[in-house]
UniProtKB/Swiss-Prot annotation:
GO terms for cellular component: membrane; photoreceptor disc membrane; plasma membrane. One of its GO terms (molecular function) is 11-cis retinal binding. This is Rhodopsin. Photoreceptor required for image-forming vision at low light intensity. While most salt water fish species use retinal as chromophore, most freshwater fish use 3-dehydroretinal, or a mixture of retinal and 3-dehydroretinal. Light-induced isomerization of 11-cis to all-trans retinal triggers a conformational change that activates signaling via G-proteins. Subsequent receptor phosphorylation mediates displacement of the bound G-protein alpha subunit by arrestin and terminates signaling. A motif ('Ionic lock' involved in activated form stabilization) lies at residues 134-136. It is a multi-pass membrane protein. The gene is rho. Residues 62-73, 134-152, 225-252, 309-354 are cytoplasmic. It comes from Gambusia affinis.
Length: 354
């Protein structure tokens, strides 16, 4: 094994020189330089500096503007709540631990940080799945006369929390475990060892299939069908400039959605699976640290993609920030009107993500 396994930790360095110490008790500067921990803390500070305001603003603007309190926006709010879980449950903790160079909060802190970071990420992930399914049902109409109601939205919210806890809670209950990973300043699921009594192998397989592959297939299917529906509508109304513009906008939205999903989650899932499949192989502390925190940066990607592309929300957000006035009101109003015209040619609901 090209690492050192101890009680509830795995350090990616062979202890031939005797310098490896518990990441709960000693600084891990033998893994990377103190400057690397400073960079990690600075990156977490950046994510908090951007992620907290944009997600908090999402909640505040939706509460303030009644017209935004639609069933679909319940899911978008759930996405913002998930991102705030990651900000407060993961990023703030990592700033503190990176300042010390090790996971100074101990085993209990590791369990809490791992749980809340995983929970936030999974709520966000399954919220994206619910959004994709909603768009497919409303725009493509596989079920005739389907209308996304408040009850459907509530069911979607419950579903996201059930699925998120189905992934985040088992390591607290003995099926796998949370341990410090990478630079040993944040905690995640144990992909690294086959420690007796934790059944890490079965949990990692379950997590990879049910909490990565299946969501990926669903998102690709739903947005692929959505794109086909828009193309068909545009082909049937080739003389309509607004319909052609709708096709381009939705195409761009779908591309960004899929890329955002892949950029956030594929590196982390791929590296985790590689480590799991090649246990004992040599890898450095940055090998898992970089993709792990790249996935957590979805707290910034999500609101930018799913909310800031919503013209109506953008108008309300500007109005809130500018004390009740929108200096771009004419432009935003014309854009919103055009959006509604475009959307009506494809479905009785909207094509845009809200």
């Amino acid at each position: 094994m090209n690492g050192t396994e101890g009680p509830y930790f795995y350090v990616p360095m062979v202890n031939t020189t005797g310098i490896v110490r518990s990441p709960y008790e000693y600084p891990q500067y033998y893994l990377v330089s103190p400057a690397a921990y400073a960079c990690l803390g600075a990156y977490m500070f950046f994510l908090i500096l951007v992620g907290f305001p944009v997600n908090f603003l999402t909640l505040y603007v939706t509460i303030e503007h009644k017209k935004l309190r639609t069933p679909l926006n319940y899911i978008l709010l759930n996405l913002a709540v998930a991102d705030l879980f990651m900000v407060f449950g993961g990023f703030t903790t990592t700033i503190y631990t990176s300042m010390h160079g090790y996971f100074v909060l101990g085993r209990l802190g590791c369990n809490l940080e791992g749980y809340f970071a995983t929970l936030g990420g999974e709520i966000g992930l399954w919220s994206l799945v619910v959004l994709a399914v909603e768009r497919w049902l409303v725009v493509c109409k596989p079920i005739s006369n389907f209308r996304f109601t408040e009850n459907h939205a509530i069911m979607g919210l419950v579903f996201t929390w059930i699925m998120a806890n189905a992934c985040a809670a088992p390591p607290l209950l003995g099926w796998s475990r949370y341990i410090p990973e990478g630079m040993q300043c944040s905690c995640g699921v144990d992909y690294y060892t086959r420690a007796e009594g934790f059944n890490n192998e079965s949990f990692v397989i379950y997590m990879f299939i049910c909490h990565f592959c299946i969501p990926l297939v669903v998102v690709f299917f739903c947005y692929g069908r959505l794109l086909c529906a828009v193309k068909e509508a545009a082909a049937a109304q080739q003389e309509s400039e607004t319909t052609q513009r709708a096709e381009r906008e939705v195409t761009r939205m779908v591309v960004i959605l899929v890329i955002g999903f892949l950029v956030c989650w594929t590196p982390y899932a791929s590296v985790a699976w590689y480590i799991f499949s090649n246990q004992g192989s040599e890898f450095g502390p940055l090998f898992m640290t970089i993709p792990a925190f790249f996935a957590k940066s979805s707290s910034i990607y999500n609101p930018m993609i799913y909310i800031c592309m919503n013209k109506q929300f953008r108008h309300c957000m500007i109005t809130t920030l500018c004390c009740g006035k929108n200096p771009f009101e004419e432009e935003e109003g014309a854009s919103t009107t055009a959006s509604k015209t475009e959307a009506s040619s494809v479905s009785s609901s909207s094509v845009s993500p809200a």
